[in-house]
Amino acid sequence: MSKSKVTSRTIRQGFTLAALIAGSIAATSGAVAGECPAGKMQPNVRPMVDHKAIGVTDVTLGAINLEKQPASIKDRELRFRKLTIEPGGIVPWHSHDDRPALIFVQQGEIVEYASNCSEPIVHKAGEIRPEVAGTSHWWKNLGKDTVILYVGDVRKDPHDHNM
């Protein structure tokens, strides 16, 4: 799908998916994402690792050029994706310093290894995780079940294929 040709059907599909996610969040009684345990947050406590993506399918469900919208945010794209992470799968190290995101765990349980937390952070189905400036991390599916994440992010470089 061309980023410049977002059809009304695509927009309706996006709204439908957003409504399904919102309903799932409501059904989980407002679950809060896993957080770094008290006293375990420190800047750059976990070094960058060079894992490659393993067992991850990343599908862009829709994208909007924000410069062409009333907000007129130059050089930014709002993107909505579905990540499927198989057991043992790895989402490689990446930064959110220039790409804020919201991650919704639709299915399964996944572990986050964040640069600013000395302990792994567990995320479970029904949780939503904000990722903002200062967040650099990688994720791993340590379970026996497939994990499904829905990701909404605002990226600057449309050629940035970091997860």
What is the predicted function of each stretch?
Residues 75-80, 97-98, 134, 144:
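Extracytoplasmic
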